[in-house]
């Protein structure tokens, strides 16, 4: 069975009160539409058609990819009309129809739905709701078979009492879809072409409409305003937290934890409150992350400890290394095994060798730091001359005194020491002591300035 997927993403989203197209509003670091596309790709379709309308250029620019065919719906005349715009491009046997503002749909749910597309049958995803207000109702015949879907505004009182709602997600034979689209009518309360009308057509044509339901009704919840968007965000995060806990992670409070990307975790990981994981993050066994930390596009090897209020981006932390509290590791940073970065230390494009230490109040940029080297408090690598970046190289077992300025390019060789308060502008050879400061001068009889008295 070949598969193509149509994602309806043309709506304006007026209740969002935003210049941003509704489907581009974010959930967990990606747009709602981005989440739907991600799920669609896992079904291995031969093509994905995205029907766009309001903000079409912005949507196309944000999400352009080789496997996406963007189809323009000039006028928003309903879900049926939107689907019809994609029909001329479909060549597969089966079509799955999804929605760009329903981001939590699970791949496993869609796989179950697709199994119903066999000769003489199509699949419809429905949901049981305590309050189905606003949903189309699933009308069944005396034998319990689906007969039709009636939109809420067109439903009678008896039909509104039905609690089985339509999600709008369909899996249909492609050769039937074009015919059904040509037979749609806008003779309804909204004056729109409803995709749901194909259900009655399918029944009339002798097809069986087989139904599936999601395990969690939130899978099919859309977002029409920012309140609903926030509800989807929180549900996504709780679901992500449950998955991580099932893999061996302890979350101090799953309600105060966010995943905004793809996270791979080991066992016996401890994550404290208010931690945000962004992009692609790899966390190995026995890692501890303190409260109020942001980890983005980084790898934390076995036994790493990140202390409170640290920001880690584009970094690799080796086994048993630690950072923080209040550490900032910027892109290109590598801490080798058991390296230590303390409070108010910032690294950018810097490598710290095994067991190297920078305890506090330090900036290390464009630097190579050897094993067991110790960086004193207040040390700054002066790596930028206003036009170009230059590198600082420290060998193994170097001792940098407090309050040093290391003016790059400069090379301080193994075993060398620099005196506190030095400005180092020249290379230092093995085991040398470098003193780069003016000699202290004590002046006798010096008188402190006095305040000028005002009249």
From Swiss-Prot:
Its main location: cytoplasm. Residues 227-247 are annotated as: Linker. GO terms for biological process: cell morphogenesis; cell wall organization; lipid A biosynthetic process; peptidoglycan biosynthetic process; regulation of cell shape; UDP-N-acetylglucosamine biosynthetic process. Mg(2+) binds at residues 101, 224. It catalyses: alpha-D-glucosamine 1-phosphate + acetyl-CoA = N-acetyl-alpha-D-glucosamine 1-phosphate + CoA + H(+); N-acetyl-alpha-D-glucosamine 1-phosphate + UTP + H(+) = UDP-N-acetyl-alpha-D-glucosamine + diphosphate. Its EC number is 2.7.7.23, 2.3.1.157. Binds 1 Mg(2+) ion per subunit. SUPFAM superfamilies: Nucleotide-diphospho-sugar transferases (SSF53448), Trimeric LpxA-like enzymes (SSF51161). GO terms for cellular component: cytoplasm; membrane. Coiled coil: none annotated. UDP-N-acetyl-alpha-D-glucosamine binds at residues 8-11, 22, 73, 78-79, 99-101, 136, 151, 166, 224, 330, 348, 363, 374. It is found in: Cytoplasm. Catalyzes the last two sequential reactions in the de novo biosynthetic pathway for UDP-N-acetylglucosamine (UDP-GlcNAc). The C-terminal domain catalyzes the transfer of acetyl group from acetyl coenzyme A to glucosamine-1-phosphate (GlcN-1-P) to produce N-acetylglucosamine-1-phosphate (GlcNAc-1-P), which is converted into UDP-GlcNAc by the transfer of uridine 5-monophosphate (from uridine 5-triphosphate), a reaction catalyzed by the N-terminal domain. This is Bifunctional protein GlmU.
């Amino acid at each position: 069975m070949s598969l193509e997927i149509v994602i309806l993403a043309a709506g304006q989203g007026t209740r969002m009160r935003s210049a941003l197209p509704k489907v581009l509003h974010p959930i967990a670091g990606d747009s709602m539409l981005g989440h739907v596309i991600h799920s669609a790709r896992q079904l291995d379709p031969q093509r994905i058609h995205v029907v766009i309308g309001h903000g079409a250029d912005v949507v196309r620019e944000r999400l352009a990819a080789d496997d996406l065919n963007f189809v323009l719906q000039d006028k928003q005349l309903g879900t049926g009309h939107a689907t019809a715009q994609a029909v001329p491009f479909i060549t597969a046997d089966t079509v799955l129809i999804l929605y760009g503002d329903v981001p939590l749909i699970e791949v496993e749910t869609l796989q179950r739905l697709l199994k119903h597309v066999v000769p003489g049958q199509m699949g419809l995803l429905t949901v049981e709701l305590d309050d189905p207000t606003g949903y189309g109702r699933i009308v069944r015949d005396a034998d319990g078979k689906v007969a039709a879907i009636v939109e809420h505004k067109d439903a009678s009182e008896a039909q509104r009492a039905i609690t089985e709602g339509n999600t709008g997600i369909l899996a249909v034979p492609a050769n039937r879809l074009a015919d059904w689209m040509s037979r749609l009518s806008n003779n309804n309360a909204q004056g729109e072409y409803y995709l749901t009308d194909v259900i009655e057509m399918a029944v009339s044509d002798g097809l069986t409409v087989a139904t599936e339901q999601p395990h969690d009704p939130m899978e099919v919840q859309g977002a029409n305003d920012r309140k609903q968007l926030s509800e989807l965000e929180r549900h996504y995060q709780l679901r992500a937290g449950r998955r991580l806990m099932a893999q061996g992670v302890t979350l101090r409070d799953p309600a105060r934890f966010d995943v905004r990307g793809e996270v791979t975790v080991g066992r016996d990981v401890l994550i404290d409150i208010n931690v945000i994981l962004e992009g692609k993050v790899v966390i190995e066994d026995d890692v501890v992350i303190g409260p109020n930390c942001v980890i983005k596009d980084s790898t934390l090897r076995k036994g790493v400890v990140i202390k409170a209020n640290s920001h880690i981006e584009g970094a690799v932390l080796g086994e048993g290394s630690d950072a923080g509290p209040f550490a900032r590791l910027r892109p290109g940073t590598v801490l080798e095994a058991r390296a230590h970065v303390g409070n108010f230390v910032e690294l950018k494009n810097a490598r710290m060798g095994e067991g190297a230490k920078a305890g506090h109040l330090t900036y290390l940029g464009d630097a190579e730091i050897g094993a067991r080297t110790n960086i004193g408090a207040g040390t700054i690598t002066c790596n930028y001359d206003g036009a170009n970046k230059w590198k600082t190289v420290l060998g193994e077992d170097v001792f940098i005194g407090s309050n040093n300025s290391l003016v790059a390019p400069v090379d301080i060789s193994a075993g060398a020491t620099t005196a506190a308060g030095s400005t180092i502008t020249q290379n230092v050879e093995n085991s040398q002591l470098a003193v780069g400061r003016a000699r202290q001068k004590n002046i006798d009889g010096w008188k402190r300035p006095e305040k000028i008295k005002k009249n």
